Amino acid sequence: MQVSQHILMIGAVWPEPNSSAAGSRTMQLIEQFKHQNWHITFACAAADSPFSIDFQELGIEKITIELNNSSFDEFIKQLQPTIVVIDRFMIEEQFGWRVAEHCPNALRILDTIDLHCLRLARQNAFKENRPFSNEDILTSEVAKREIASIYRCDCSLMISSYEMNLLQDVFKIDKALLHYTPFLLNPIQENDTTNWPSFEERAHFVTIGNFLHEPNWNSVLYLKESIWPLIRKELPHAELHIYGAYPSPKVNQLHQPKTGFLIKGRAENAQAVMLNARICLAPLRFGAGMKGKLIDAMTQGTPSITTTIGAEAMHGDLKWGGYITDDPVEFAQKAIHLYKDKTDWLDSVNRGVQIINQIFEKQSHAKLLINRIFDLTNNLKAHRAKNFIGSMITHHTIASTKYMSRWIEEKNKKQ
């Protein structure tokens, strides 16, 4: 008989499933923990958001915590969770050492969401107009912090097989410290597809993504400057509907009804928006992790045109549900072709269904995750004994971070 667990999830932000792929990912993990009847406490230091989930409705205890404050130490000592899931390495830096010191027997899991060091290194290479290489991450300050965080944790959840391989091949991280858990999605059934709007019932192009996320903002500029004018020239009545949370004035300035380039702002329901579009455009020139917009497109029967980075680790050996190209002219040509060619459009829809059902099949990935958690909790001492580097980094982190944090706390008291 398996022991019931008490999970503490420490979030970077309060989860907003309709605002970002990261928010959806957090909800997928919560769903699996709830299926096990585990008690969940969700803690976060961020300001409340009106768009976050209803914790009370889900039966989850919601706690606001503070950075650099010893009140967290008392909180976790009283809570005594058996498992702590930390959202992203920056939050692990803030709270991981406190968990290790005051709740040493709790299993520490890092949900990386994406490899930040990879995304930022690609972003820097793009801005410097040069190809990305592994040297960029090996010399990155963010990589040193992120890899240290992975070592300090008992297990890091990887959403991308590409990033999982990168950690093992480039950083030589033991596979025992990693676990591949992509998006956990329900399979698309035949009765789902029969309810989708047809080719003729759909209209226009769509792109979607949190505007605070630099790869998304860059892709909108790329569409505006290099891709959309080519599409609009061939399809003068087509529109591009651009959805995203947190649009700033600079985003809204791009709104241009005359050319069909429409900034729509936050989507109340991203799936509904995607369901009524004929094509999803995602010309991402840098980034990492899984692209929520492309997942939403495939789950709603919407073909997509994207880049190599956009489709990275998302389709295995399967053919993409649309087209992949890094050339802006070809990108526009493929978008125009797919918008007009019903046969190719239907083939692309079917390939998207195949990807969702084979790569992101919830039941098998969820079972592997829960089994891995049980295996780690049952053998935690032996598991940690094999991770000497992790214990060494944790030792020095507690020694240094502890006093810096206490200094900040005292300084804050005096202000």
Where in this protein do the model-derived segments appear?
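N-terminal subdomain of nucleotide-sugar transferases
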Residues: 1-51
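Acceptor-binding helix/loop patch of EC 2.4 sugar-transfer enzymes
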Residues: 16, 105-106, 110-140, 200, ...
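Acidic donor-binding loop of glycosyltransferase active sites
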Residues: 81-82, 275-289, 302
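A short, active-site helix/loop in glycosyltransferases that binds the activated sugar's phosphate group
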Residues: 94-95, 143-176, 251
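Conserved catalytic-core segment of nucleotide-activated headgroup transferases in glycan assembly
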Residues: 169, 173, 178-275
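Short hydrophobic beta-strand element within catalytic cores of glycosyltransferases
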Residues: 293-296, 303-307
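Conserved acidic donor-binding segment of nucleotide-sugar-dependent glycosyltransferases
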Residues: 321-329, 337-342
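C-terminal amphipathic helix plus adjacent low-complexity
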Residues: 351-415
